[in-house]
Amino acid sequence: LLGGETAEMPGFYDDGKYDLAGFGVGVADKSDIINGSKIKEGDVLIGLSSTGPHSNGYSLIRKLVTDFEEKITIGGKERKIGEVLLTPTRIYVRPVMDVLSKFRSSVHGMVHVTGGGFYENVPRMFPHAKEGKKQLVAMIKKDSWEVPEIFDELIKRGADPENVFSTFNMGIGFVLAVSKKDAAEILKRFNANAKKFAVKGSPVMKAYEIGYVGHTDKVIKGDFKGSKEMTQFY
């Protein structure tokens, strides 16, 4: 294993029960790996829409939702909240690989927005600044994408509005840092081909320009995890 975690998921497993999971390891030429080292100030951040909470934040969700049979209105239709929360996680491989087939040199960084939301995930693609250099950070425009209604429902049920971006993906499940000169074309390609890569029964993916790469003069040592200096909203 190159890395991993133990998901405790409190309140989910009964005593004596366990979860069996699998993983895959890929091999690539070093020159083909997009590791964030080419990210620079002024790069555009493109966000790809999620289908909902995906597979993260459910320890909190189970505290907020006591009756999964309860009906709520989503998209103008009445649905069971449990059914909405079971919407499958969007897989971004096909649309991202399609963009890389034409714009690989213009894509400088990529990251999934998983557990820990924006604050714990977006900074993962940024390299640590060398001594005396500016530290790159994500500048996120909060109202630049459509937030799925399920997140508003969770806030109504008690999720802290100040902390939802450090728990949930809030409608953006994948972020790319791309060169400014090709950002418009990359965005256009994602949206033009979205229906082709759509999974039956799931909403069609949308791509948004959600911000840009800026910098901070602060020296941030150690792990970027959860650092609010590394992901700033405007």
Language model segments and positions:
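Glycine-rich anion-binding loops of enzyme active sites
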Residues: 2-58, 212
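N-terminal low-complexity, intrinsically disordered patches enriched in charged
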Residues: 35, 51, 66, 124-125
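Glycine-/charge-enriched secondary-structure boundary and capping motifs
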Residues: 13-18, 71-86, 90-234
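Acidic, glycine-rich loop-and-beta core segments that form the ion-binding/anion-interacting portion
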Residues: 41-83
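Short alpha-helical scaffold segments that flank and stabilize functional sites
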Residues: 25, 60, 186-189
